[in-house]
Amino acid sequence: MPTVLAIAVALGLSTAQLQERLLYGSLARQSLIAFAWLSSPPPGQALGLDKSRYTPKRHHGLVAGLLEQVDSGEIRRLEIEQPPRTGKSELAVRKFVPWWMGRNPGKSLIVTTHSDPLANEHGRDCRDVFESPAYQLAFPGRACQLREESKAMDRLQLRGGGVAIFTGRRGLGAGAGADLILADDLFKNSDEAESPAVRDAVWRGYNADVESRLNSEESPVVLIGTRRNEDDVQGRLFDPTNAHYDPNQARRWTRVRLPALAETGDPLGRLVDEALWPEKFSAEFYLARRNHRSDIIRIEHQTQDQCNPVALEGNYFKRRWLATYEAAELPKHLRIYCASDHAYRKDQRNDRQCLLVVGIDPSDTIWVLPDTWWERATTDVLVEQMIRIIGARQIGRAHV
């Protein structure tokens, strides 16, 4: 057996350099975050041991730890919700798939997503990692290497027999089984998720195809993505008010929500309204979206950024009940009422305060009046607006 010195000489390295590489390789083999670091060398370098393009944050460490528990068999069903552009696919697909295959070269894995083009992109990126010096360092065994004749973007096979298949959600229904299935963003965009027909099709595909492709009842499933609709797959799995909800199925899952702005009981221990990745998207960026005048942007923020979808139609008000009117159409004889909504709790700072002024005509139609006020303001400004409305509308009684 060659000595460490002989191997170092053969590779053109010093003994210290070789030992450093072996240490990094061993660490990357055991730790997903270490593997992500090692397999993301700086531009122009094939391998960077002490430098990397990958800079993991707290939420990446949490996700990596959960995925490691999937690999160890501690978690059989894992669901993670993250805002857009916060590194979910980079870690959970492009890094996790080669890492898991390297550790399990005889097992098979399926990655499914909303479309074949994205699936192929994932496959190409994973292939690049498989062929990188970092992967060779972490998983040097012959069984862990790609077969030369099986390097298509949609199907990568290792010499040890394991296969990674990448497919759009429509292509999941037929073919070989898998020891792990990873579903990444099953809806392409909000337009898809707003379609009841598409939601039903994705749900049927999830139930019929994902479960049927697993090689055993012990085979894990990872569902990761950005929320798009309150009735998406996650909504049907975990919302007790959803008609499809099954408590027996829901309790099998380990579920983690990572909203852009922290809420009470944050899994990372963040303060309320602390940003998930402040170096990339600040709290001010998300607060501006939360308080935007556009209904669409506010709904996108709540649904995608906060991983907490809201219905375009609420439980109390339906779109068809609402209509606009011209000033000349406003009746002269109305019963005037004013209601207020105050952002007074600590976790509501930066929210707008609202003074809603309505008039009710003799037919009980409610008219929202133009002096309705909705702004971010201090309490003294709010009281001034109350006094203004009371005076302008000659309101006889007011309660605060």
Range-by-range predicted roles:
Residues L356-R397:
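Nucleic-acid-processing active sites and adjacent nucleic-acid-binding tracks
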Residues S340-Q353:
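An active-site-proximal beta-strand-loop segment
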Residues T112-G173:
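Conserved nucleotide-state-sensing and coupling region of NTP-binding domains
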Residues E194-D266:
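ASCE P-loop NTPase helicase motor core
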Residues G265-H342:
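ATPase catalytic-site recognition across NTP-hydrolyzing enzymes
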Residues S150-D209:
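Conserved RecA-like ASCE ATPase "motif II neighborhood" in helicase/translocase motors
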